[in-house]
Design a protein with these regions (language model features):
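Domain-core detector
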Residues: 1-155
Length: 155
């Protein structure tokens, strides 16, 4: 797996996007619909404010300091133990816990990176010199299971 610390170095627009998000307690991943995910920070099943704050701060530190998944996973385990968080998908096994930490880490870092890049690419000065985009899917090898629709947009 690629080392995301090399690919996702934080930049101003990325951090601004993540820092604007507000904590949103949720019981399931689909409690929040469509574009609302862009404005709220949520972890499915995390309904207590202190738990959500700790997860958010862990993601924020991971972005600011370039922490990798292994470091984030250790912090995830510590947060879960500290709050006695139970009843979440993946809880019952080491593989499940690793999966859940990875989902939280990668989703938030990728989303903020993409939103930050979009902010950069849609500046009027940038659009004046690059008025169109070309979709290139998976050239860096991050997507091991690409969606057919994404592959169809390539090029």
């Amino acid at each position: 797996m690629p080392d995301f610390r090399l690919a996702f170095r934080p930049f101003r627009e990325q951090m601004a996007f993540f820092e604007r998000k507000v904590n949103v307690p949720s019981t399931r991943w689909d409690d929040i619909r469509l574009g609302d995910h862009a404005h709220g920070f949520m972890v499915a099943g995390a309904i207590r404010a202190a738990l959500l704050d700790d997860f958010r701060n862990a993601v924020l530190r991971a972005q600011r300091e370039g922490r990798g998944l292994a470091e984030f996973t250790r912090e995830f385990e510590s947060i879960v133990a500290k709050h006695g968080w139970t009843g979440w998908t993946g809880e019952g096994s080491a593989k499940g816990r690793a999966w859940r930490a990875k989902v939280i880490y990668q989703t938030n870092i990728r989303q903020s990176y993409n939103a930050g890049r979009y902010a950069q690419l849609t500046r009027p000065a940038m659009l004046a010199v690059r008025p169109w985009w070309e979709y290139r899917h998976g050239e860096r090898g991050y997507s091991r299971n690409p969606r057919p629709i994404h592959q169809s947009w390539h090029g």
